[in-house]
Amino acid sequence: MRILLRMKLHKLQKWENYLASVEKMDYKTFAPLEQGSDAELTETTAENLFVQISLYATLLEKYDLKKCAGDGTDFEKTVRIMQWLTDNTFYSGAAFKWNADNPLDILEYAYGQDFSHAICCRDKSVVFTDCLMALQIFAYPICLLSTNSGCHFVTHVYCRELQKWVLFDPSFNCWFTKDGKLLSVWELKTLYLNNDEPVLENYSFNHTDRCKEIYLAGFIKQNLTNLSTWHDNSMDRRGYKRNDWESKKEFKTKLPDFKMM
């Protein structure tokens, strides 16, 4: 079985094969969205989540992030950083390599490489979050989890000019609005629970507009049932021991709604 799985994953390292696999996803397998519960999750503080860790200085210098972000609002800078990440790395839900939760390691593997070095949604979210934090834009990664173990990672970003959290998906270079209003993950979930639909903004699946409906149903809507983040952005558990998922950072913490300055 393990050999067969590796053969399948190897086949999916080609973009056309991975794209075809996403296009063939069966809507019937998607779980219904539920209210979910965070009762078993721990809580955290702003002091835990938003530490200026030492590797941020390296990120800023090595990738010239201030130039990439440019001037403007937190939203404008966030969009530019997300576009930079999209332009320089590929996304794949069948990524062949598991990386440490360390943006320098992830970018060393994926930056400027072809699709065979694509990274998963967790890696995209971690890099995106840390790049924003290096620029002193408050952000944290979110694990979205359905009732049937479907999973996707996105990022919450605090836009100070709006005084609110806004949801971004760096794997698909997009965000969500309703009536022109930028949505948080909580607002997006409530919208779907009320049988309403968001507007998908700026969507890009590795520089194509393919699979939008599958993305909304299979990557986003079904996975909004359970929401969690990491307890802190410290260097603790940012290493990765081969074939040991437990060595990575845990996502067992409630999403905070801090008002940042």
Explain the meaning of each model-derived region.
Residues 1-23, 77:
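Membrane-proximal basic amphipathic "stem/tether" segments
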Residues 88-91, 145-149, 172-176:
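Solvent-exposed loop/turn segments at secondary-structure junctions
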Residues 94-154:
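Active-site neighborhood of thiol-dependent amide/isopeptide-bond enzymes
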Residues 74, 117, 121, 209:
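Aromatic-acidic/polar surface patches that form glycan- and anion
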Residues 74-79, 87, 133-139, 161-165:
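Loop/turn elements at helix/coil->beta-strand transitions in domains of secreted/extracellular proteins
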Residues 157-261:
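His-Asp-centered catalytic microenvironments across diverse enzyme cores
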Residues 23-116:
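Secondary-structure boundary elements
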